[in-house]
Amino acid sequence: MEKKNINEVIANLSVEQLAGMIDHTFLKPFGTAENIEKLCAEARQYQFAMVAINPAEVETCVKLLEGSGVRVGAAIGFPLGQNTVECKAFETRDAIAKGATEIDTVINVRALQKGQTDIVKKEIEDMVSICKPAGVICKVILETCYLTDEEKETVCRIAKEAGVDFVKTSTGFGTAGANVHDVALMRRVVGPVIGVKAAGGIRDLDTALALIQVGATRIGTSSGIQIVEAYKELKKGL
C-alpha cells in the first residue's frame, strides 16, 4: 500500500474515528477492581473500540460495558505465547463463553524460530475456527521485536491464509513495541483487507498518527485518553 500523506490522514480522520481505532488496555499482572472499573468507564465515555484485558477479567468487563457498544477483548497465551496449541484453544473457547468478542493470541515465537511453522499454522487456524462461527474478531500477535523481517512475513502470510481479522505487532511486554517499519511490512504482506494492530509503547499522538499513516487500523495503548485529547486540540487548530 502507498504511504499516505500525514495531512491527508488528519483531514480524513475525525476524533470519533480515531477513538474508535483504539483498544483501551489494562494487561498488568496486578491491580484492583477500581482499575478495571475505571478502564471500562473510560472506554464507555470515549467510545474506544474495545478494552483489552486478561481472561480473568472478561466477565467483569462484559457486565460493566453492557449496552455501551465497546467490545471486550481477551489476551490469549499472554504474554509469552509458549502455551501448547491445545491450551490456547481452550483459553479461547473459555474467554468466548464468558463473553469476549475479540481475541488477541500470541504466537509461539520459539516454534517459529525453530522452523516449526506447522505449530504456528495450527494454533492460528484453530483460533480462526473457534472465533469465526462465534462472530468473534481474532488477532494474531507476532511479537515483532524478537523476529526477523522474514519471520514477520512468514507469520503474516500464514495468518492471511488462515483468515484472521488482524495481525498485531506486540504484547507490550517484549523488548520493544510497534514501529513504522514493522507496521508497513505487515500491511504490505497482508494487503488492504486484513487489519493491522499496532501495540506496545504508543504513548502519544504523533506516534499513533505515524503508525496509522503506514497502515495501522487499530492502536493498542493505555494512553488512549491522552492521544484522543491531543487530537481534539490538533483538529481545533486546523
UniProtKB/Swiss-Prot annotation:
One protein family per Pfam: DeoC
Pathway where it operates: Carbohydrate degradation; 2-deoxy-D-ribose 1-phosphate degradation; D-glyceraldehyde 3-phosphate and acetaldehyde from 2-deoxy-alpha-D-ribose 1-phosphate: step 2/2
Gene3D superfamilies the record matches: Aldolase class I
Entry's Gene Ontology cellular component terms: cytoplasm
Annotated EC: 4.1.2.4
Compartment list: Cytoplasm
Keyword Cytoplasm part of the UniProt annotation: yes
Keyword entries, A-Z: Cytoplasm, Lyase, Schiff base
GO biological process entries: 2-deoxyribose 1-phosphate catabolic process; carbohydrate catabolic process; deoxyribonucleotide catabolic process
EC class (word): lyase
Catalytic activity, reaction form: 2-deoxy-D-ribose 5-phosphate = D-glyceraldehyde 3-phosphate + acetaldehyde
Record: active site: D104 (proton donor/acceptor), K168 (schiff-base intermediate with acetaldehyde), K197 (proton donor/acceptor)
Single GO MF descriptor: deoxyribose-phosphate aldolase activity
Keyword Lyase part of the UniProt annotation: yes
Role played: Catalyzes a reversible aldol reaction between acetaldehyde and D-glyceraldehyde 3-phosphate to generate 2-deoxy-D-ribose 5-phosphate.
Entries under HAMAP family matching the protein: DeoC_type1
Family: Belongs to the DeoC/FbaB aldolase family. DeoC type 1 subfamily.
Protein name as annotated: Deoxyribose-phosphate aldolase
Name of the gene: deoC
